[in-house]
Amino acid sequence: MPQDNVRIARSLYDHWNERQFDKIAELMAADGEIVLVGSDTHFRGPSGAIEFSQMWADGFPDGRVNIDNVIASGDHVVLQFTGKGTQTGPLKSPTGEIPATGRSITLNLCDIHEIRDGTIRLVQSYFDSASMLMQLGVMPEAAVGAKA
C-alpha cells in the first residue's frame, strides 16, 4: 500500500513537469484539497488541483520540479523537492498578482500527501515564500546580522 501511494504522489510531480493538468485532476479525490500552509490558501477538488498547477505554470512556464527525498508511512507520503524556473509570467499570490520579473529562482519545498483508496485526499504544501519573494526581487533581502 505505501508503495502504491508513493507512485501516486510521485506521478503528481511528473504530470506537473509535463503540464498534464488533466492527469493531476484525475489523482485528486472529489473532496480532496491542496493547502498552501503558510498562507492558509485552499484549492479544492480536481478543479482546484488544476487551478493550483496552472498558477505555478503560468508564473514559471519553464518551471521544473525534482524530487529529492520521499518518506512513506501508511496513508501518508512526504516529498521534499526542489523547484526551479524563471518567472516570465504573472504569479498569483494570496496578496495579489506578482507581475513577471524575468528572474530565475530555486525553491526548496515539502509536501505532505494523504492518499486513500488510490486518490489524493490532502496535500499540505510547505515552502519558504520569503526566499521566493527575495529571489524574485519583490521583497528586500534580509539584513544579515540585523538586530531588532
Spans of model-derived segments:
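C-terminal and inter-domain tail/linker signature
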Residues: 1-148
